Amino acid sequence: MSDVTHANGAVANEADDALVIGDHSFSSRILVGTSRYPNPQVMLDALEATGTELVTVAIRRVNIENPAPESHLDLLRRGGYEVLPNTAGCYTAREAVLTARLAREALGTDLLKLEVIGDDETLMPDVEQLLDAAKTLVDDGFTVLAYANDDPITCRKLADLGCAAVMPLGSPIGSGMGIVNPYNLRIIREMIEDTPLIVDAGIGTASDAVTAMELGYDGILVNTAIAQAQHPVDMGRAMRKAVEAGRSAHRAGRIPRRLYAEASSSMEGRIGT
């Protein structure tokens, strides 16, 4: 990739623009879910198209202790992907902590995507249980990536607890509604400067990914938008390009919005003057 030169002379080297989460570093800023694909081969092809290095797996849906040949985990490992176990399906802090510890023991990773859901219809986080689980798991040495509401106060509390990344939702899980509250996401970004922020849930197409990155977010997590697309591999490729474009645009610095027009050409030298 090329360097980006800012107006003040600063140069942003895109090749060195790694996503750092705790002690882990990734060149790709896309995290991808591994469910709902038409078949395993489509999943693998789509993952490759995104350029992702970190893929998330729901622990309750896989046999982590005795993964059979050609199992979900086996395919991902042989593909060279780092697995990010998640606690999807947990409704209490106790369930999430137990699931996380089982995953660490079986998979040998400190990485964890923490989800503590409040109900089956909205799949929104239960904030009280989420904060309780986050504190316990951070104290227990996990590198916690916490799925959260798009609430600035909750997100700040998660960052203050020591979560390695905070993942506010763009809209409800699987809805494809995109970024429905960019104002809250912008406030969260301004309030939390030193902790990676990743938009998780609701992304429906590539333009949503661009929006997330232009808001200054460090990455996105996407699953349904790719897995359920008419052509998952093409959508995976589109997401990769969208994240790169949005990241570059954010780093380049957009022009301020103006209420009135401003001519781009000088008015000097007009004919008849």
From Swiss-Prot:
Gene3D superfamilies, sorted: Aldolase class I
Catalytic activity entry: [ThiS sulfur-carrier protein]-C-terminal-Gly-aminoethanethioate + 2-iminoacetate + 1-deoxy-D-xylulose 5-phosphate = [ThiS sulfur-carrier protein]-C-terminal Gly-Gly + 2-[(2R,5Z)-2-carboxy-4-methylthiazol-5(2H)-ylidene]ethyl phosphate + 2 H2O + H(+)
Main enzyme class: transferase
Domain of life: Bacteria
CDD domains associated with the record: ThiG (cd04728)
Protein family per UniProt: Belongs to the ThiG family.
Name of this protein: Thiazole synthase
Organism: Salinibacter ruber (strain DSM 13855 / M31)
Gene that encodes it: thiG
